[in-house]
């Protein structure tokens, strides 16, 4: 039993750290926009064709929440979460009251963008950095609270400590 708990804790720590790492790698060297003004085609983003299919809808939905400048982060999250596959490409409907038939990519994107916008607002209010927001997308909004009283900036060690506190 102790070994199973250890494995679960390790996975709780490693997966979100992996998610943040992949998002960071995907965004390294990415300019804010390509030459034609399109952040989806900016060099280095490495999006699958499936994720690119959702780019316009993600951008439109982000604009509705006044977070259009975070479109590339949302697309990177989708790429890491599912590669754009399935009815929940943002992995945002797991705890929703929707039936499997009601879960659609558009509902997933709407829920994810709304959640990301809320996380951005919370981080802004508490003075936390964008990396904390990205990590909180996976860990939950409580990670921003946790970060806000521990230096306000996401670090690898902070995310490990947070994950360990949940085991």
Describe the residue ranges of each PLM region.
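Catalytic and substrate-binding regions of cell-wall glycan-acting enzymes that process beta-1,4-linked
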Residues: 96, 107, 136-167
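N-terminal Sec-pathway targeting helices
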Residues: 1-16
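Short, surface-exposed glycine/acidic/tryptophan-bearing loops
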Residues: 83-105, 152-156
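Membrane-interface motif at the C-terminal end of an N-terminal transmembrane signal
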Residues: 17-34
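Active-site-proximal beta-strand/loop segments in catalytic clefts of secreted hydrolases
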Residues: 77-82, 93, 136-138
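Export/targeting segments at the very N-terminus of extracytoplasmic proteins
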Residues: 32-84, 106-125
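Residue-level detector of well-ordered alpha-helical segments, enriched
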Residues: 69-74, 88-89, 129, 133
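Active-site/pore-lining binding-face segments in mid-to-C-terminal subdomains
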Residues: 118, 122-147
